[in-house]
Amino acid sequence: MDEIKFGVFLPFYAFRTTKTGSSSFNLIRDIVLECERLGYYSVLLDDHLMLKKMPILECWTTLSALSSVTERIRLGTMISCNSFRNPALLAKMAATLDNISNGRLEFGIGAGVQKNEHNAYGFPFPSSKARIERMNEAVEIIKKMWTEEKASYNGKHYTIKNAVCEPKPVQKPHPPIIIGGGGEKLTLRVTARHADRYDWGYLASLELYKRKLKVLEKHCEAVGRSFHEIEKSCWPAGQIFIGENRKELEKRVLQLMPKGVILEDFMQTSFVGTPEDCIKQIRQYVNLGVTHFMLFFGDLPDLRGLRLFAENIVRKIDQIN
């Protein structure tokens, strides 16, 4: 069986630690360093420019800073919004980060979904079909920039001519490409064509995840690619709240859950349980061929859940295998 990996999705835009409400890079850095110490495989950041009035640091700049203070843990995006950056420039940024981090980049990319965010920053927000077409072309350009001496491309949405990206990424042939999204007609076809890893974030049920895998497998057949070449990744829950005492844990969830949300609804999209409960749920996905799990700890920046999961699951992975 392939190695099972656990990565942490870090909602760094949610941390308000100063009187002005500004995000604290020091806090983000300390959480990432703790993830590295505990043995997590990766930390992935979301790529948003604004979320209502919440403070948020720019994703790629933050990753660059984190890469200079860490040594082993892999760093990347879940996912980088294609609409925000020219793909040739994004390829250059990613190659630079892979060099700074000595080959630790996880490159996640998606078509973009937040219309208000695009409008506020002046980015076009065309139809879903057009955004996915753009993402497909962007990935083709990025792969060319990473692997060719001079890259040229003449597509419907993007054109480059003799573009040089030096130095190339440390990872060969290139950093792993994660394509985010679950659209069955278009996005999963792009995933079948280009992705090294499939991850759509949180899926509401094991049955829905099975369905997405079947659709992806059909697209792989259509484009002439082996379904087994693509690593399978998933989120076992929208948010994870893990504790040794379930009764005390549920009290904490009541304190941490968003105001105005019904507890039953919140529990349906979250995992609330003991390490043993979590292992049972993870095993179900392992049996489907999943080898990579993304974890969104709902109690961050409190480190108790992060540490408990590492001590009882990450460091005892043989129990799952």
Residue ranges and their predicted role:
Residues 56-77, 134-141, 309-321:
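Alpha-helix-loop-beta-strand connector modules within alpha/beta enzyme cores
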Residues 2-23, 83-152, 201, 207-211:
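Flexible, glycine-rich active-site loops centered on histidine and acidic residues
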Residues 2, 127-169, 202-291, 301-304, ...:
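An alpha-helical appendage that flanks or caps ligand/catalytic pockets
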